[in-house]
Design a protein with these regions (language model features):
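Intrinsic low-complexity, repeat-rich intrinsically disordered segments enriched
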Residues: 1-88, 173
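Extracellular receptor-binding modules and their adjoining Ser/Thr/Gly/Asp/Asn-rich linkers
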Residues: 13, 66-201
Length: 201
């Protein structure tokens, strides 16, 4: 059972009175503001999400933090992506895109395309260029594992190039600049989706 203690602020300062040993400080409410700083001196976990996974954010789309200093970080998702302006469609995850069209990227409709940009990410662990504005914005995976639409026979470890229809295909002797990534799993069918790894060729 959680024991709640009153929050006591020293008059004329930003200090918070120390709680009894072993007790947690719980801040709740829809708007907690004007906090100068919070100093953590304990070796235990400092900030805990008490409402369940995928609930709550640090910062917002309109209220940024500046720089995050940390020893390490972890994420559940598996790729690093960057936002790009797409032409006239909101492409589904796994679609192979190239640098062409009326915007920055478009669906790749050329086989073994040398202007290939990458694969639309489904859920990036880290998204760059998040402030990009436009009608059609797609996250393109730059590094890590990502689902990719493929066609034809693919063996695990195969180098993947564009197939000319928004999909990728295996290629044993790709030309420079055409490789999207390597297959993490095999596939034997017409069109489907498998995981590939991009950025480590």
């Amino acid at each position: 059972m959680t024991t709640w203690y009153p929050l006591i602020v020293n008059p004329g300062s930003t200090q918070i009175q120390e709680l009894p040993s072993g007790q947690d400080l719980n801040l709740t409410g829809s708007n907690i503001s004007n906090v100068a700083s919070i100093t953590i001196t304990s070796s235990s976990t400092a900030l805990i999400n008490g409402s369940g996974n995928t609930v709550g954010n640090i910062g917002s789309s309109t209220g940024y933090f500046n720089t995050l200093f940390a020893t390490a970080s972890k994420a559940l998702y598996a790729d690093i992506a960057e936002n790009y302006l797409a032409d006239s469609a909101d492409y589904i995850p796994g679609t192979v895109l190239c640098f062409d069209g009326n915007a920055e990227v478009t669906q790749c409709n050329t086989d073994s395309c040398a202007t290939v940009a990458g694969v639309v990410s489904s859920a990036p662990a880290y998204l760059m260029n998040s402030g990009l504005s436009g009608e059609h914005i797609v996250p393109v995976a730059l590094l890590g594992r990502v689902p990719c639409r493929v066609q034809g026979t693919v063996k695990k470890g195969s180098m993947m190039v564009s197939a000319g229809n928004g999909c990728a295909r295996a290629e044993s002797s790709p030309t420079i600049g055409t490789v999207i990534g390597k297959a993490v799993e095999s596939f034997d069918g017409n069109v489907g989706t498998i995981e590939i790894v991009v950025g480590r060729l």
